Amino acid sequence: MKLQKQLLEAVEHKQLRPLDVQFALTVAGDEHPAVTLAAALLSHDAGEGHVCLPLSRLENNEASHPLLATCVSEIGELQNWEECLLASQAVSRGDEPTPMILCGDRLYLNRMWCNERTVARFFNEVNHAIEVDEALLAQTLDKLFPVSDEINWQKVAAAVALTRRISVISGGPGTGKTTTVAKLLAALIQMADGERCRIRLAAPTGKAAARLTESLGKALRQLPLTDEQKKRIPEDASTLHRLLGAQPGSQRLRHHAGNPLHLDVLVVDEASMIDLPMMSRLIDALPDHARVIFLGDRDQLASVEAGAVLGDICAYANAGFTAERARQLSRLTGTHVPAGTGTEAASLRDSLCLLQKSYRFGSDSGIGQLAAAINRGDKTAVKTVFQQDFTDIEKRLLQSGEDYIAMLEEALAGYGRYLDLLQARAEPDLIIQAFNEYQLLCALREGPFGVAGLNERIEQFMQQKRKIHRHPHSRWYEGRPVMIARNDSALGLFNGDIGIALDRGQGTRVWFAMPDGNIKSVQPSRLPEHETTWAMTVHKSQGSEFDHAALILPSQRTPVVTRELVYTAVTRARRRLSLYADERILSAAIATRTERRSGLAALFSSRE
């Protein structure tokens, strides 16, 4: 009972959630107090995005869980956590259906353990080489990629994807991920020579799917494909939820192992946003013969929910290709492709390719220089970049009320074209397009520097400037931007989709740009959970790009403000970036890496 009291006190101090204590008492309330504590800490860490709880976090050392010290008197000094956990009916090695699984020195929730093994098996064992006519493939690639004296990593990535069942292509902004996939799909169709080749395109969010549709469409129009060949590439991408057949009001999906997807090739963009459970469900729904090509940026923020799947996969990218694979890729591309050393995680390494040249950001781009410096964790270089005369980046302080008002004025100017089109009652598609040109990004949800506070202040400020006209008894007004916060497959709206409230003669409706390019309007009363989105979190901005992005960092240090968060925000900007940040907060963020504890990288190398 003493431990239960300690756990409840931890809830009061917001060190645990009520859910964590409820889980611990339900599955291990009658067990040794140490097992109950481990269950609570495991549940807590899962809520923080971690896949497992290493036993080192339960031992009295510098890596121990912060709550451990306060509970030592209740559980006693344990000499062997592994022995204690396995003596419990709530824990097994995975050979019994227990709530918790101990695998090596890592403790898992049962479902997370199952998900992790599904993903590890897929990339380790299911992944295999595909036999190709190397002479024909080399000839096809030469026609699609210009001849170059230096190594063309886009061409290498295409060769990787065309010779493996599963491939992962990672690259920063402007490295040509979409161009690469357009060309490799063109090569695939040309080499299929009329054989069945059902291709599907998908991304985690509606915004990312719409961007993939637009950018891939542009890239494909530049390629030498016949009209018949072009028909074989889908005109639009869908969200992963839509692809898998999410059911209204249900967690069940239409497509799973018993009813797999009807496709031969699947391209998935923005793979860094895919959490471990979603990746597992996607893998379960794939037919045995399907090829899968994952695109993403390994340096971006990890998924909101548990895991950092793309990061764990790409942990082996720097190890390079095996010697045999490097020789094959050299033959296919006509240039020397360097080999790495060793054979660890060979199957996975031979399926990865990093795009290493940015075609968007040259040496004259402040955004590109800043993103690279942040990615290296080089605080001095970040400071130097801002001291140079780059015209596409600017840094502002937010130390006073005057600074805050100046930031609101700049936001008003940023949304200027949108507000002008709104006043001119332009067509909904033009208004939506204009809104997406500028975006305020926040690290936090609450407080004056968070999404909630900032959205309220912007609305008040715009009302004062007579740019919008809010009614006292309604949240709805002409031009209110909203973001969907919960999937509604019946309406075809998903988490992250953005709509604009407009009255076009039928009363106020909310207008959305759909992935297929069409515009759809919905009555406000029919919308699923949603929120105003003049400002959005950096997490929500993933999969989107804006001509001008403005990042606002809080005035105090907080664990969520990390290098990956700042890098992700900076790389949302296409042409201009505004950064509102205190020097100390920015430096601390760049020095702080996001940590997601999982066993996936270990499973790739050891095949446990």
Swiss-Prot record:
Residues the record lists as binding ATP: 171-178
CDD domains the UniProt entry points to: DEXSc_RecD-like (cd17933), SF1_C_RecD (cd18809)
Null allele phenotype: Loss of RecBCD enzyme exonuclease activity, no effect on recombination proficiency or resistance to DNA-damaging agents. Cells can be transformed with retron Ec48-containing plasmids.
GO function terms (MF aspect): 5'-3' DNA helicase activity; ATP binding; ATP hydrolysis activity; DNA binding; exodeoxyribonuclease V activity; helicase activity; single-stranded DNA helicase activity
GO cellular component, as recorded: exodeoxyribonuclease V complex
This protein's UniProt keywords: ATP-binding, DNA damage, DNA repair, DNA-binding, Exonuclease, Helicase, Hydrolase, Isomerase, Nuclease, Nucleotide-binding
Assembly and interaction partners: Heterotrimer of RecB, RecC and RecD. All subunits contribute to DNA-binding. (Microbial infection) Lambda virus GamS protein interacts with the enzyme without displacing any of the subunits.
Protein name (record): RecBCD enzyme subunit RecD
Organism the protein comes from: Escherichia coli (strain K12)
Lineage: Bacteria, Pseudomonadati, Pseudomonadota, Gammaproteobacteria, Enterobacterales
